[in-house]
Swiss-Prot record:
Residues 191-453 form the Protein kinase domain. It comes from Rattus norvegicus (Rat). Signal peptide: none annotated. Belongs to the protein kinase superfamily. AGC Ser/Thr protein kinase family. GPRK subfamily. SUPFAM superfamilies: PH domain-like, Protein kinase-like (PK-like), Regulator of G-protein signaling, RGS. Residues 54-175 form the RGS domain. GO terms for biological process: desensitization of G protein-coupled receptor signaling pathway; G protein-coupled receptor signaling pathway; inositol phosphate metabolic process; intracellular protein transport; negative regulation of G protein-coupled receptor signaling pathway; receptor internalization; rhodopsin metabolic process. Pfam families: PH, Pkinase, RGS. This is G protein-coupled receptor kinase 3. Its EC number is 2.7.11.15. GO terms for cellular component: axon; dendrite terminus; dendritic shaft; dendritic spine; glutamatergic synapse; perinuclear region of cytoplasm; postsynaptic density; presynapse. It is found in: Postsynapse; Presynapse. The lineage of its organism: Eukaryota, Metazoa, Chordata, Craniata, Vertebrata.
């Protein structure tokens, strides 16, 4: 029966994988719904205050670029050539060999430069033209050939064209998407969890599918009780910090994180899914690798380490078991539990796996940085070639003996190793950091330029164009059977109680990596959600075309902000009523959907603006003269933050003006005014 359950778990998992690759959006069991266009009023202020609506910020986001491009192609004829040229350059930069780059660069020169020069319409500088002409004439077609044009294209788009985008419906759509992004609160309900694929000291790793996009991930779940029992809180929090550091920027050689969240019992990391097994497993199945095969893995691992070191992260646990293969055979470095940020202070702790730890790591109290990873790389490459660590002779398991050898023994390399390989390993395995390859000040560049990697095109490596020596079997899970992986004994943690102070440690644990979320959305549901939203908005416009539109009412007045909020209504204050609010310098107005009657509360009647909580939801409490109070709730985190801020600032400014105003202005007034028609509003209503 257990065997049957294992087979069914594997089949279910593999089917989910195949369907997610073919049509991930079709596999989505939850729908992403964009908020109404009126969200723009709040989101524009929210993003502007955080410096998030500059040209560079929007243009360099995946969703921002797509919307800006769409706007230019459909609305701004003069910008079409620049945008198309920009996209061509980006595609050119991805080309992996010189012949293709030469062919494409000549085509681009003819289409976007020469044609405009002949018609005297070329808008770019003489220096940019001469740069490309000079390099093309010498057939020097590096990936950065058109870089001067990238800079000038961006400069030409960031002025009036970007300002027009900011006034367009495409910017409104950008605000809608950003509202969704900034209001993500994940739980287990947002994932379909499949079979277990691994287990570590604190928890398990599962294959899972994200419910709203259909994308497959690995979910690493750490048991909070087990973490507490082993006093591993610092390690767990450190892993989340290290993953957040290395998961920004595009690095295809690290198992990166897209989300982190926690439940009352678990800490969850949502990571890149690797279906090809680990190098330790394949070493046992395949046997040792040849120099050529090892060179392939070394080159990809070097780029992974280079990315980490650029982020000032030292990995500290490089070994075959932590190198995972994807389904095509390319590798990524996984498990950053022991990684450390050395940007401000160098570590000195003795951590890692015996047989791979650098001498300076073993010497307690000695500070080190990325140097430790280059020594570990030498140990790991030796194992791929010989089947054991250079300091683990005769299969000894005595950790002290392994450490002693690491600190004292000069590694004897086999005669069968080529001179180039011997030079590489001797350089990496230097006990003296100052003499070690990668530690002269050039970092990964020193390894890339080593004779062992002669002929390697590192751009080709980065684009994963070299054929892997080993391709994991298709249609298999490439992980141990779920029953072989086993499970934790619940009795171990039976006496462990999680207290409020334990949970407080994880209050800042949730995280979402913006660029990775946007990439996930664009790959899966972006077009479908936009199309559906366009239909909904078109129907609403057709239905409400005779009614006074929200933005029309606010336009031309000194309305600070407007948008939907929920107001606690009815005589017993038990029902939430959705209303549209307008904040002016001297009043707050609101009305129900489709209503012409306008309610008004002046700043003079408000006694305080406070933050409160109702059923674990943050709310805004307005205390009004006469003992009344208004409770408002927002539909997203950014809306709550901005409404609370603007209401507080407006109230404080109104109170300041009231204190300076003549006393006759302080005569009692009705707390709430109702109008059958919208009140008259002058262009400047700051007078009280």
């Amino acid at each position: 029966m257990a065997d049957l359950e294992a087979v069914l778990a594997d089949v279910s998992y593999l089917m989910a994988m195949e369907k997610s690759k073919a049509t991930p959006a079709a596999r989505a069991s939850k729908k992403v719904v964009l908020p109404e266009p009126s969200i723009r009023s709040v989101m524009q202020r929210y993003l502007a205050e955080r410096n998030e609506i500059t040209f560079d910020k929007i243009f360099n986001q995946k969703i921002g670029f797509l919307l800006f491009k769409d706007f230019c192609l459909n609305e701004i004829g003069e910008a079409v050539p620049q945008v198309k040229f920009y996209e061509e350059i980006k595609e050119y930069e991805k080309l992996d060999n010189e012949e293709d780059r030469l062919h494409r660069s000549r085509q681009m020169y003819d289409a976007y430069i020469m044609r405009e020069l002949l018609s005297s319409t070329h808008q770019f500088s003489k220096q940019a033209v001469e740069h490309v002409q000079s390099h093309l004439s010498k057939k020097q077609v590096t990936p950065t050939l058109f870089q001067p044009y990238i800079e000038e294209i961006c400069e030409s788009l960031r002025g009036d064209i970007f300002q027009k985008f900011m006034e367009s419906e495409k910017f409104t759509r950008f605000c809608q998407w950003k509202n969704v992004e900034l209001n993500i609160h994940l739980s287990m309900n947002d994932f379909s969890v499949h079979r277990i694929i691994g287990r570590g000291g604190f928890g398990e790793v599962y294959g899972c599918r994200k419910a709203d996009t259909g994308k497959m991930y690995a979910m690493k779940c750490l048991d909070k009780k087990r973490v507490k029992m082993k006093q591993g809180e610092t390690l767990a929090l450190n892993e989340r910090i290290m993953l957040s550091l290395v998961s920004t920027g595009d690095c295809p050689f690290i198992v990166c994180m897209t989300y982190a969240f926690h439940t009352p019992d678990k800490l969850c990391f949502i990571l890149d899914l690797m279906n090809g097994g680990d190098m330790h497993y394949h070493l046992s199945q395949h046997g040792v690798f040849s120099e050529k095969e090892m060179r392939f893995y070394a080159s990809e691992i070097i780029l992974g380490l280079e990315h980490m070191h650029t982020c000032f992260v030292v990995y500290r646990d490089l070994k075959p078991a932590n190198i995972l293969l994807d389904e095509y055979g390319h590798v990524r470095i996984s498990d950053l539990g022991l990684a450390c940020d050395f940007s401000k202070k160098k570590p000195h702790a003795s951590v890692g796996t015996h047989g791979y730890m650098a001498p300076e790591v073993l010497q307690k109290g000695t500070c080190y940085d990325s140097s430790a990873d280059w020594f570990s790389l030498g140990c790991m490459l030796f194992k791929l070639l010989r089947g054991h660590s250079p300091f683990r002779q005769h299969k000894t398991k005595d950790k002290h003996e392994i450490d002693r050898m690491t600190l004292t023994v000069n590694v004897q390399l086999p005669d069968a190793f080529s001179p180039e390989l011997r030079s590489l390993l001797e350089g990496l395995l230097q006990r003296d950091v100052s003499q070690r390859l990668g530690c002269y000040g050039g970092g990964a560049r020193e390894l890339k330029e080593h004779i062992f990697f002669k002929g390697i095109d590192w751009q080709y490596v980065y684009l994963r164009k070299y054929p892997p020596p080993l391709i994991p079997p298709r249609g298999e899970v490439n992980a141990a059977d779920a029953f072989d992986i086993g499970s934790f004994d619940e009795e171990d943690t039976k006496g462990i109680k999680l207290l409020d102070c334990d949970q407080d440690l994880y209050k800042n644990f949730p995280l979402m990596i913006s660029e990775r979320w946007q990439q996930e959305v664009v790959e899966t549901i972006y077009d479908a959600v936009n199309a559906e939203t366009d239909k909904i908005e078109a129907r609403k416009k057709a239905k409400n075309k005779q009614l006074c539109q929200e933005e029309d009412y606010a336009m031309g007045k000194d309305c600070i902000m407007h948008g939907y909020m929920l107001k606690l209504g009815n005589p017993f204050l038990t029902q939430w009523q959705r209303r549209y609010f307008y904040l002016f310098p001297n009043r707050l107005e609101w009305r129900g959907e489709g209503e012409s009657r306008q309610n008004l509360l002046t700043m003079e009647q408000i006694m305080s603006v406070e933050e409160t909580q109702i059923k674990d939801r943050k709310c805004i409490l307005l205390r009004v003269k006469g003992g009344k109070q208004f409770v408002l709730q927002c539909e997203s985190d950014p809306e709550f933050a901005q409404w609370l801020k603007e209401l507080t600032c407006t109230f404080n400014e109104a109170q300041r003006l009231l204190r300076r105003a003549p006393k006759f202005l302080n005569k009692p007034r009705a707390a709430i005014l109702e109008f059958s028609k919208p009140p008259l509003c002058h262009r400047n209503s700051s007078g009280l």
